């Protein structure tokens, strides 16, 4: 690649980045177009992009020139000081005028021609520059103009005109009043000498400043808005207009209020969900329906051998329901009344039965006892064989017994205690 070029286009042609095509290439494009070549053929022959060929030919057919338009800073300035002053004058006369209306007035009044008329974007840029210059005015000038609009006089920091001046030693207070009157005449003359348009501009700026302040709602307005919010979180335009007419608020303010209120409601709903989840988490151990021994502490077994109380063996069942006890009772041993109760496998349906032994008939082989079960389990439990005992025996104490029973250590004395429980 040569040093004079900075790139190669998609057709293989060289070009200098940011600079227009040379005049020789432009002339060849026009000559080939006159000879009847299509733009796509010209693009392929001269290795120039199709867009570039179309742009040059379009400008040639429109203006008859093959010269490129001005680039960089070589473009003649159309926003001359005279044009800028006219634009500022039109804007002062009508602050709500549009840029295209200013452009039409410049043409109709002969300020500009079709050759040097600024574009709409140029006029908008001039208006932005004028607004920024006004905003960059000193604070003193801004406050002076605002006081002029409010009917006050004097410079910033001094007393308003309606306050009486303090008397200076050696000078009567009437001089101060005359001086204030003179200042009022000065300000009136300034405002009458071309400040009418500035007053309108300052009113517009003051209105914009006031629009940026937060809206203060009365209690009646808040109640009406909250009532409407309870009905729907997204009121339509008809509901907003009806509410605006009712509470004397702009419809846009009502729309913004509902947007802020919905955001507040979402925050509150999030907090409510968090509290609800925290309250739903179990803070205690769930009680099993089968009263397993892992929940309640079992009563410790007696240290005295069981053979000293009964001649039979301990109940050999491993069912969890039979070892079921309550920790609220005082420690008492559990005893069996059967000599040779046969070993039975645990039945799943017996897990809900209580381990209390109730006497059924004292005439059958001394005493015989059955386990107490719910009524719906009677048919199943009647088929279970129960062993009998030929000696004086004791029964298992149910968890519901709250009377402490003292069991003596000798077998002959036990008969005088157990009849009390029957």
Swiss-Prot record:
GO terms for biological process: anterior/posterior pattern specification; astrocyte differentiation; axon guidance; axonogenesis; blood vessel development; brain development; camera-type eye development; cell differentiation. Residues 185-194 have a biased composition (Polar residues). It is found in: Nucleus. Residues 4-130, 210-269 bind DNA. Residues 157-201, 269-311 are annotated as: Disordered. One of its GO terms (cellular component) is nucleus. Residues 7-63 are annotated as: PAI subdomain. Transmembrane segments: none annotated. InterPro entries: HD (IPR001356), Homeobox_CS (IPR017970), Homeodomain-like_sf (IPR009057), PAIRED_DNA-bd_dom (IPR043182), Paired_dom (IPR001523), PAX_fam (IPR043565), WH-like_DNA-bd_sf (IPR036388). Residues 345-422 are annotated as: Required for suppression of NFATC1-mediated transcription. Residues 82-130 are annotated as: RED subdomain. Transcription factor with important functions in the development of the eye, nose, central nervous system and pancreas. Required for the differentiation of pancreatic islet alpha cells. Competes with PAX4 in binding to a common element in the glucagon, insulin and somatostatin promoters. Regulates specification of the ventral neuron subtypes by establishing the correct progenitor domains. Acts as a transcriptional repressor of NFATC1-mediated gene expression. Interacts with MAF and MAFB. Interacts with TRIM11; this interaction leads to ubiquitination and proteasomal degradation, as well as inhibition of transactivation, possibly in part by preventing PAX6 binding to consensus DNA sequences. Interacts with TLE6/GRG6. Belongs to the paired homeobox family. It is linked to Defects in Pax6 are the cause of a condition known as small eye (Sey) which results in the complete lack of eyes and nasal primordia. This is Paired box protein Pax-6. It comes from Rattus norvegicus.
């Amino acid at each position: 690649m040569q040093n004079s070029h900075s790139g190669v286009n998609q057709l293989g042609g060289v070009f200098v980045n940011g600079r227009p095509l040379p005049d020789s290439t432009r002339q060849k494009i026009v000559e080939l177009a006159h000879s009847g070549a299509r733009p796509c053929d010209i693009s392929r022959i001269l290795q120039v992009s199709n867009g570039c060929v179309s742009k040059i030919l379009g400008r040639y057919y429109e203006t008859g020139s093959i010269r490129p338009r001005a680039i960089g800073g070589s473009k003649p300035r159309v926003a001359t000081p005279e044009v800028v002053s006219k634009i500022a004058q039109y804007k002062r006369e009508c602050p709500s005028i549009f840029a295209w209306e200013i452009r039409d007035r410049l043409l109709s009044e002969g300020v500009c021609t079709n050759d040097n008329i600024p574009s709409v974007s140029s006029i908008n840029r001039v208006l932005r520059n004028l607004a920024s210059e006004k905003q960059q005015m000193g604070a003193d000038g801004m406050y002076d103009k605002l006081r002029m609009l409010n009917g006050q006089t004097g410079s910033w920091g001094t007393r308003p005109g309606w306050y009486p001046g303090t008397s200076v030693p050696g000078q009567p207070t009437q001089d101060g009043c005359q001086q204030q009157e003179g200042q009022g005449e000065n300000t009136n003359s300034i405002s009458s000498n071309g400040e009418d348009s500035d007053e309108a501009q300052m009113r517009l700026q003051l209105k914009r400043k006031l629009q940026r302040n937060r809206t203060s709602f009365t209690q009646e307005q808040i109640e009406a808005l909250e009532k409407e919010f309870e009905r729907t979180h997204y009121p339509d335009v008809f509901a907003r207009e009806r509410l605006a007419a009712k509470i004397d608020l702009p419809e846009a303010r009502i729309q913004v209020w509902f947007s802020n209120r919905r955001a507040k409601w979402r925050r509150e709903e999030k907090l409510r969900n968090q509290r609800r989840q925290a309250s739903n988490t179990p803070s205690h151990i769930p009680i099993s329906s089968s009263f397993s021994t892992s929940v309640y502490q079992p009563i410790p077994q007696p240290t005295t051998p069981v053979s000293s109380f009964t001649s039979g063996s301990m109940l050999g069942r491993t069912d969890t329901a039979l070892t079921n006890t309550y920790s609220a009772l005082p420690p008492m041993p559990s005893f069996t009344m059967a000599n040779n109760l046969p070993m039975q496998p645990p039945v799943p349906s017996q897990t809900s039965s209580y381990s209390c032994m109730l006497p059924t008939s004292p005439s059958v082989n001394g005493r015989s006892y059955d386990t107490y079960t719910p009524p719906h389990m009677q048919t199943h439990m009647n088929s279970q064989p129960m062993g009998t005992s030929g000696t004086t025996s004791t029964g298992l104490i149910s968890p519901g017994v709250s009377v402490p029973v003292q069991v003596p250590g000798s077998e002959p004395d036990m008969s005088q205690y157990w009849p009390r429980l029957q």
